[in-house]
């Protein structure tokens, strides 16, 4: 399980970079809310994360159903974190760090035991 988590984390580093860049563009160039910026960053990064983790971490096939489960769960998580950040007036960097930490742990557990549970 540790080996899988290390692989998942490695892909997560790239995923986080993608997410943060898109988030920054939304906040500072497009002047969106944190909820929208976080969700947009997520949408761009989640596809990379799903396909990379399916192939390299879990060695599983990609199906539309698996994709919908993954995107749905992570999308809800993204919106909740962004909404809470807006309500608490958190600085954008705190939102990014918070979502990155929560999504790493929750995303791994959800991927391993729900999305890719049948993967060999």
UniProtKB/Swiss-Prot annotation:
It is a multi-pass membrane protein. It is found in: Membrane. GO terms for biological process: polysaccharide biosynthetic process. Its main location: membrane. The chain crosses the membrane at residues 10-30, 34-54, 65-85, 90-110. Involved in O antigen modification. Involved in the translocation of bactoprenol-linked glucose across the cytoplasmic membrane. Belongs to the GtrA family. This is Bactoprenol-linked glucose translocase. It comes from Shigella phage SfII (Shigella flexneri bacteriophage II). The gene is gtrA.
């Amino acid at each position: 399980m540790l080996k899988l988590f290390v692989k998942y984390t490695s892909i997560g580093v790239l995923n986080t970079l993608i997410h943060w860049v898109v988030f920054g563009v939304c906040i500072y160039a497009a002047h969106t809310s944190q909820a929208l910026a976080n969700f947009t960053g997520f949408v761009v990064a989640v596809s990379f994360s799903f396909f990379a983790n399916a192939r390299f971490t879990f060695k599983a096939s990609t199906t539309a159903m698996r994709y919908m489960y993954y995107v749905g769960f992570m999308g809800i998580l993204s919106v909740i974190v962004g909404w809470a950040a807006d309500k608490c007036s958190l600085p954008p960097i705190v939102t990014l760090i918070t979502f990155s930490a929560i999504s790493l742990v929750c995303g791994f557990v959800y991927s391993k035991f729900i999305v890719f549970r049948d993967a060999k």
